[in-house]
Amino acid sequence: MYKRCNKKVTCVSFEETFKKTGLPIITLYNDCCALNFLVDTGSDVNCINKDKLKYLHYTETNKSGNMVNSSGVNKSNVIMMPINDKHGIAVVEFYILDLSIQFDTIAVYDGVKIDGILGSKFCKNAGLIINYNDCKIYS
């Protein structure tokens, strides 16, 4: 599910987006493509908006599952996708969902475009500590 290729203590700030939205949103990269992820410990798994896939490098898997969101229950395929920041790279499992309506609503009201969700399994496996007072995520 999560494989860190080079392990270091990292710190990522979400202060700017938190001031705009009240949500912990961080920017990570897939090669040179910037992706804004909502860090959502209420979500079990990681999700990527299907509209973004045409711009990304990833590996398809044979795995799929039923996902529950505001649109109901949907079957979702799973991909493995490398994401990185200035501290290193990780290959992460993502469920593909059409989250355009939900993410576009946040973009209209708060001015921040979200491309995906990093869920609680990612946070646990990466050893993340979310500090809302400092608006930083540590690993």
Predicted regions and their residues:
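Hydrophobic residues embedded in beta-strands of well-ordered beta-sheets
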Residues: N46, C135-I137
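A short acidic Gly-Thr/Ser loop motif
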Residues: V39-D44
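A compact, surface-exposed functional segment
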Residues: K50-D85
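Short hydrophobic alpha-helical segments that form membrane-spanning helices or hydrophobic packing faces
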Residues: C47-K50, A126-L128
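Eukaryotic short linear interaction motifs
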Residues: V45-N46, F103
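Aspartyl protease catalytic core from the pepsin/retropepsin fold
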Residues: E16-L38, G72-I129
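Short glycine- and acidic-rich boundary segments immediately preceding or forming the N-terminal edge
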Residues: M1-F18
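Short acidic-glycine loop/turn motifs at beta-strand connectors
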Residues: N131-N133
